[in-house]
């Protein structure tokens, strides 16, 4: 019986020694796994960045008034691909068109039928831009509001 007790104690000591090494190994593996996950997440974030659209790139270069007019123009150009075609133009031409739209819409602010006239101007802009941005301006895209 003494021999069995001694062997049992030795077995427990050996088992305890193996567990302590395994615990350290498990901790190291857990830390390595965490660092791998962090590395994988940062790599996914880098690859998930989408290239910016033409509209986003243009918005970075516009002032606040021009951004507002771009939003307005986006609602005016409702046909498929019309707004995208507009964005393909030269940046300076787009900016001057947006400034012209702002100046025309400002004429309608505070007027009695301003909202109706702005909606009419939307249709005018839509028709004027069908011919391209080169002819767009005071000659073919004006509001019916009287400037004061």
Swiss-Prot record:
It is a lipid-anchor. Residues 1-17 form the signal peptide. It comes from the Bacteria. Keywords: Cell outer membrane, Lipoprotein, Membrane, Palmitate, Plasmid, Signal. It is found in: Cell outer membrane. Residues 26-61 are annotated as: Disordered. The keyword Aminoacyl-tRNA synthetase does not apply. Induction: Induced when grown at 35 degrees Celsius. GO terms for cellular component: cell outer membrane. A lipid is attached at residue 18 (N-palmitoyl cysteine). InterPro entries: Mlp. The keyword Cytoplasm does not apply. Residues 40-61 have a biased composition (Basic and acidic residues). A lipid is attached at residue 18 (S-diacylglycerol cysteine). Pfam families: Mlp. An outer membrane protein that may participate in pathogenesis. Some human Lyme disease patients have antibodies against this protein. The Mlp proteins probably undergo intragenic recombination, generating new alleles. Belongs to the Multicopy lipoprotein (Mlp) family. This is Lipoprotein MlpH. It comes from Borreliella burgdorferi (strain ATCC 35210 / DSM 4680 / CIP 102532 / B31) (Borrelia burgdorferi).
């Amino acid at each position: 019986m003494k021999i069995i007790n001694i062997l049992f104690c030795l077995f427990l000591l050996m088992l305890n020694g193996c567990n302590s090494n395994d615990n350290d190994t498990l901790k190291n593996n857990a830390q390595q796994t965490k660092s791998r996950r962090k590395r994988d997440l940062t790599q996914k974030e880098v690859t998930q960045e989408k290239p910016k659209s033409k509209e986003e790139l243009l918005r970075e270069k516009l002032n606040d008034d021009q951004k507002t007019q771009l939003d307005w123009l986006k609602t005016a150009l409702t046909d498929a691909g019309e707004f995208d075609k507009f964005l393909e133009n030269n940046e300076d031409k787009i900016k001057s068109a947006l400034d012209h739209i702002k100046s025309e819409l400002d004429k309608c602010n505070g007027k009695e039928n301003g909202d109706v006239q702005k909606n009419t101007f939307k249709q005018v802009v839509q028709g004027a831009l069908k011919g391209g941005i080169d002819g767009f301006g005071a000659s073919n895209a004006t509001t019916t509001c009287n400037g004061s």
